[in-house]
C-alpha cells in the first residue's frame, strides 16, 4: 500500500468510499495531516493512488499552495524509477487531488519496525536507490525538505519510490530563509533548520544521514522528545554514538558516509548528492 503517516479521522471528517468525479474511491490507504490517500479506480477499473486534500483545509491558502506546488514538482521529476509516478492533478467538487500510479508497497518506517524480510535482504540496494532518487530530484533543481522513512516506499520486489513533495522547493541560488512555521519533521531536520537559519539543499543530505543511521541501527542519531532536545543533541555531540557501535556489521565506509551527512556545518557535508551516491556504492559493494 502507499504508506504515509497514519492519523485518526476526526468525528466530522470520517472518510467513506464512493464516487469522486470520474473516479471511484475504493479503499482508504492512509491519512496524512493534509490529505487522504485512496485506492481509486476509473471507468475502466484501472487502479490509481488518489491523494485528496482534506475538506477542512479548503480555505487554508498556505496548505492549498503547498499541495499544488508539490503536485507540480512531482510532475516535473516523475520520469525516474525512484519517484512515484505522476498522472494528473486538479480539482473535483472543490477539492484538490493528485492522481498517481498505484504502488503495492510499505514505507520504510513500517518495514524496519517489523523487521520485514524485504528490508533485511535488500537493505544495501534500498540505501543506494533512495539516495539515487534524491539525486534525481536535486539534479532537476528541487530539494525535498521532508526526506524521512515514511516518505520512502518499498515494494515487495524492493523497488524504491520517493513520495510526498508538499514541502519541496526549488534549490535556491543562495541560502533560503525559513518560514516562520518552519514545517518539517524535527527528528530529520538539520541544525540550521531547527535554528531558523537560512539553508540549502544540504538539509536533504542531513536528512538522508538520519534515515540511513536509523535504518541500519534502529536508533535515532539525535533522540529527543522536542525540537529543542533534538537540536541540543545535534549541537553537543558528547553523547553521540557512532553507527558501528550500535551495529558492528555496518561497513566502515558506510559509517563514514553517514557521519559526513550528519555534520553540524552544512559546508562539511557532501556538496552534492551524486558524490554521496558514489561513496555509498563503493562502501556497500566494494
What do the PLM-derived regions correspond to, one by one?
Residues 57-76:
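AlphaC helix of the eukaryotic protein kinase fold
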Amino acid at each position: 500500500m502507499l504508506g504515509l503517516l497514519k492519523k485518526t479521522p476526526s468525528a466530522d471528517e470520517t472518510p467513506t468510499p464512493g464516487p469522486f468525479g470520474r473516479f471511484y474511491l475504493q479503499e482508504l490507504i492512509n491519512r496524512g495531516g493534509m490529505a487522504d490517500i485512496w485506492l481509486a479506480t476509473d471507468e475502466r477499473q484501472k487502479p490509481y493512488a488518489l491523494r485528496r486534500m482534506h475538506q477542512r483545509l479548503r480555505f487554508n491558502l498556505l496548505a492549498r499552495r503547498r499541495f499544488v506546488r508539490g503536485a507540480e514538482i512531482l510532475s516535473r521529476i516523475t520520469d525516474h524509477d525512484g519517484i512515484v509516478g505522476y498522472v494528473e492533478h486538479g480539482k473535483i467538487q472543490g477539492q484538490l487531488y493528485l492522481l498517481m500510479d498505484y504502488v503495492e508497497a510499505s514505507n520504510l518506517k513500517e518495514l524496519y519496525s517489523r523487521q520485514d524480510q524485504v528490508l533485511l535482504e535488500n537493505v544495501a540496494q534500498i540505501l543506494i536507490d533512495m539516495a539515487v532518487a534524491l539525486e534525481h530530484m536535486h539534479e532537476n533543481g528541487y530539494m525535498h525538505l521532508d526526506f524521512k522513512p515514511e516518505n520512502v516506499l518499498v515494494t515487495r520486489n524492493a523497488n524504491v519510490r520517493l513520495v510526498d513533495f508538499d514541502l519541496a522547493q526549488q534549490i535556491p541560488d543562495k541560502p533560503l530563509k525559513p518560514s516562520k512555521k518552519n514545517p518539517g519533521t524535527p527528528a530529520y531536520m538539520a541544525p540550521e533548520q531547527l535554528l531558523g537559519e537560512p539553508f540549502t539543499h544540504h538539509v536533504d543530505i542531513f536528512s538522508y544521514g538520519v534515515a540511513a543511521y536509523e535504518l541500519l541501527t534502529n536508533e535515532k542519531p539525535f533522540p529527543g522528545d522536542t525540537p529543542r532536545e533534538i537540536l541540543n543533541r545535534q549541537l553537543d555531540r558528547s553523547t553521540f554514538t557512532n553507527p558501528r557501535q550500535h551495529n558492528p556489521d555496518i561497513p566502515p565506509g558506510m559509517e563514514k558516509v553517514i557521519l559526513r551527512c550528519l555534520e553540524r556545518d552544512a559546508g562539511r557535508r557532501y556538496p552534492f548528492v551524486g558524490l554521496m551516491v558514489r561513496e555509498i556504492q563503493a562502501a556497500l559493494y566494494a
